Amino acid sequence: DKKKIVFVDGEDTNMFVEDRVKDGVVYFKRELYPDQKQIHLQEYMQHVLPISFAFPTAKVNKGQKKERRVAHSDPRDKKTYVFEKEYEYYHDYKYSKYAFTMPKAGWDCLRHYEIMGNGCIPLFPDIMNSPRYVMMRFPKALLTKVAFFDKNDPKWLDQNYEYFQAEVMDHMKKYNTTKALAEHVMKELSLINK
């Protein structure tokens, strides 16, 4: 019974596993945006749904008293990747107000969620260009505002940091933890299987 099969495609590309799409099974796709090479699959898309990374619920940390404006780790400069242990990497975010992030192999990457999960606000300069069905439960509108003010009025952004951090953390807990993702997937499956 196809209703009992769920396929989760976590690949960093937007290409589909054609046989699974054509099988008609429920297909969760992380990098879900059109590719003209697979336009012939359009008729099979009724069971394809977006999915994203999530941060472990037990590891969510509001952060500490902020010691610096921007985290040392910066994906735009590989020389800043100096941490060998997860706790060192997370410590950098916990004590920073903001941290830069960007697409990695695909638009969705765990780094975005690690930043938020450690009480830090992602600075994602190109977030407004992300495809519509990628990172559907990510706070894109909120982080578009943050990116705008970081570029045009960083002093105002810093004066309103507590507000934006609270908004990011509220969103994170509601939509971007592993528990929230599991609940969302189960809800989607219950709607499809009616």
Where do the protein language model's features map onto the residues?
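Nucleotide-sugar donor-binding catalytic core of glycosyltransferases
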Residues: 1-166, 170-193
